[in-house]
A protein has these predicted regions:
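N-terminal cysteine/histidine-rich coordination modules
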Residues: 1-113
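Histidine (H) residue identity feature
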Residues: 40, 45, 70-73, 96, ...
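Residue-identity detector for threonine
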Residues: 7-8, 23, 38, 53, ...
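Domain-exit/linker segments immediately C-terminal to small folded modules
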Residues: 74-186
Length: 301
């Protein structure tokens, strides 16, 4: 693990790559005995892991080790008045699981009330969510699409999926949705989606939006995000993807609407980008997009 935080709130993280990590850690915890405990006869400097809100021990900062400084789950250790170790969250943590299980399983809302904070962040930073979704996928999100995604995010309670975090709000926004019609969808040129549409024989015409095209075909095809995946590699890096499918109506089934796959592909996404973006000071807000969030993303009861 390459970063830590200090509470269960959604807050800026402290990265081990920060040259002043030790000083910042000690300034933050002060003389709070909860963060420095004797565990099995050894002093442990503790914090929380942002992905699962479980206690972690800091390694390589206060005692030399053979690898770069990092954090590791502190199984069974509690930080008084901050957090209790949770085995269920540990089992679901990407840095324990190493791979996503692709199941849209819900967390019990009584167990993780901070999920309401996640929902609040999605609403307050919805223009950044849309911006990053566009940037990483190449899909131009119109205001109508932004409305549909906001409404679906609330209906599906996507903020309450087991793997949902502050980091992957943009990906869960589209992953929780059933799919958009490709007809007249606007796509940025030279992206993965653009290339796959060309390979599948879709007719793409230049859009009025610079550097983009739109899909001219109207055969009922959809673009749907089928999976959000992650793998933690041997260097402790979290690699993430969105899996997409292009599907079209099955012409052999006439009595109901069913689809068949035309193509499948994956797009790499960077979750760390969003956590940095929400703290960016010089952001130019898109008020129309924020107004959509205000209309559709009402306070949770």
């Amino acid at each position: 693990m390459k970063e830590i935080k200090f509470t269960t709130n959604y807050e800026p993280v402290l990265s081990f790559s920060d040259w002043n990590f030790k000083t910042k850690y000690e300034e933050r915890v002060g003389n709070n005995p909860g963060y420095i405990q004797i565990v099995h006869g050894e002093a442990k400097h503790l914090a929380l892991f942002p992905r699962c809100n479980n206690p972690v021990a800091i390694l390589g900062v206060y005692k030399k080790i053979n690898v770069a400084p990092h954090a590791r789950h502190a199984k069974g250790v509690n930080i008084p008045n901050v957090v209790q170790y949770d085995e269920y969250k540990f089992q679901k943590c990407p840095y324990h699981n190493k791979r996503a299980n692709y199941i849209k399983e819900y967390v019990d809302e009584t167990e993780e009330p901070q999920r309401q904070e996640l929902y609040k962040i999605a609403k307050e930073h919805y223009d950044k969510v849309i911006y990053l979704l566009q940037k990483e996928t190449g899909i131009y999100i119109t205001l109508a699409m932004a409305e549909t995604l906001a409404e679906n995010y609330v209906v599906k309670r996507a903020y309450n999926y087991i793997d949902a975090t502050l980091y992957n709000i943009p990906w869960y926004l589209i992953y929780s949705f059933s799919g958009f019609p490709l007809y007249h969808m606007i796509i940025r040129k030279n992206t993965a989606i653009y290339k796959h549409l060309l390979q599948c024989g879709f007719i793409l015409k230049d859009s009025k939006i610079k550097g983009h095209v739109y899909v001219e075909n109207n055969n009922g095809s959809l673009l749907t995000a089928t999976n959000y995946r992650y793998v933690v590699d041997k260097n402790d890096n979290l690699n993430e993807w969105l899996d997409f499918s292009i599907i079209r109506p099955d012409e052999l089934v006439t009595d109901t609407l069913l689809y068949i796959p035309v193509d499948r592909f994956s797009i790499n996404v960077d979750s760390y980008y969003f956590s940095n973006l929400i703290h960016y000071q010089n952001w130019n807000s898109r008020q129309q997009v924020l107004d959509i969030a205000e209309r559709y993303m009402k306070p949770c009861n």
